[in-house]
């Protein structure tokens, strides 16, 4: 955060010294607990030329987000969205459905976001959402390093065909069901979904492959 603020200061200073420099810039951003960030930081982003950010929200569940080691809450994220709206910064949200620790109530909290935050879609603060396909477990990823703790097994070593003994209800078929339900809820509230058909075709391919192996 310190380095980002310093970068913004340099760019703001350059713009002030060069009135014709109307450049914009974009990047990835991380939501944080709102008590660690003030409004001045968001204003500084906008004044330096930021007009679009990609942010990993991941889920509507604070519990699941914490298990990913992402320590911001949904309320924290909403504060950032309000600030983005105020300072005309657009964003695209990245999501993961069916994370290893996700229970049905967590999934419902994700679905609730689409109606709750439809106002940010209407204001074009949120310009799109990336829903992904289905979660793949890679060996060297943080969750991949917890395979034994989460009692994970795989169908034919396929990274997307996993099962967790700690969350047995979340089999592949349930993950696909939740992913499709999330997709439908996003459409219901007019959220633009990026790479929509590509992701759905990937899910279809993965599901058919697992069915053949079973």
Predicted regions and their residues:
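Intrinsically disordered, low-complexity regions enriched in small/polar residues
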Residues: 16, 27, 31-33, 54, ...
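Detector for methionine-enriched segments
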Residues: 1-3, 68, 83, 95, ...
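Repeat-solenoid scaffold signature
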Residues: 83, 89-108, 121-126
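C-terminal accessory regions of radical SAM enzymes
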Residues: 105-214
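Generic preference for well-ordered secondary structure
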Residues: 29, 52, 94, 187, ...
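Conserved SAM/AdoMet-binding glycine-rich loop
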Residues: 1-92, 99
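Noncatalytic linker/hinge segments flanking ATPase motor cores
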Residues: 32-37, 65-75, 92-100, 133-142, ...
């Amino acid at each position: 955060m310190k380095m980002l603020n310093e970068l913004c200061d340099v760019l703001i200073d350059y713009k002030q010294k060069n009135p014709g420099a109307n450049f914009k810039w974009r990047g990835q951003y991380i939501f944080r607990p709102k008590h660690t960030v003030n409004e001045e930081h968001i204003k500084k982003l906008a004044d330096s030329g930021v007009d679009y950010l990609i942010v990993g929200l991941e889920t509507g569940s604070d519990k699941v987000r914490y298990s990913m080691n992402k320590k911001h809450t949904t309320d924290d994220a909403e504060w950032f969205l309000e600030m983005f709206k105020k300072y005309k910064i657009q964003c695209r949200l990245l999501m993961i459905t069916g994370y290893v620790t996700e229970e049905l109530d967590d999934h419902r909290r994700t679905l609730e976001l689409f109606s709750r935050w439809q106002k940010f879609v209407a204001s074009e603060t949120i310009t799109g959402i990336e829903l992904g396909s289905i979660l793949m477990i890679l060996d060297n990823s943080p969750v991949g390093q917890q395979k034994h703790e989460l009692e994970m097994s795989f169908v034919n070593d396929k990274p997307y065909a996993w099962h967790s003994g700690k969350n047995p209800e979340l089999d592949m078929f349930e993950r696909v069901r939740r992913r499709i339900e999330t997709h439908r809820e996003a459409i219901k509230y007019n959220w633009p979904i990026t790479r929509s058909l590509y992701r759905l075709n990937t899910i279809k391919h993965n599901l058919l492959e697992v069915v053949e192996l079973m």
